[in-house]
Amino acid sequence: HDRPTFCNLAPESGRCRGHLRRIYYNLESNKCKVFFYGGCGGNANNFETRDECRETCGGK
């Protein structure tokens, strides 16, 4: 399926200092991977679960 363009963005932790475990879609490996999110800002390539990431962006 056509994945949204934000799936191609690099994970962005944003400007806050939280340490939230989130998932992002990695275009090169075609996998949903973990990164740590600060809690504000960032971009749309940021999911709470791997399933949500896979449903939106595809990948493994």
Curated annotation (Swiss-Prot):
What keywords are annotated for this sequence in UniProt?
A: Disulfide bond, Protease inhibitor, Secreted, Serine protease inhibitor
UniProt cross-references to Pfam families, sorted A to Z: Kunitz_BPTI
The BPTI/Kunitz inhibitor domain extends over 7-57
Q: Which SMART domains match?
A: KU
Its localization reads: Secreted
Q: Which SUPFAM superfamilies match?
A: BPTI-like (SSF57362)
Main localisation, per the record? secreted
Q: Name one GO cellular component term.
A: extracellular space
The tissues where this chain's protein is expressed are given as: Expressed by the venom gland.
Cysteines joined through disulfide linkages: C7-C57, C16-C40, C32-C53
State the InterPro entries in the record. Kunitz_BPTI (IPR002223), Kunitz_BPTI_sf (IPR036880), Prtase_inh_Kunz-CS (IPR020901), TFPI/VKTCI-like (IPR050098)
* The organism's place on the tree of life at top rank: Eukaryota
Q: Which GO terms describe its molecular function?
A: serine-type endopeptidase inhibitor activity
Give the site residues for Reactive bond for trypsin: R17, G18
Q: What does it do?
A: Serine protease inhibitor.
Per the similarity annotation, which family is this? Belongs to the venom Kunitz-type family.
Its recorded name reads Kunitz-type serine protease inhibitor 2
Provenance organism = Daboia siamensis
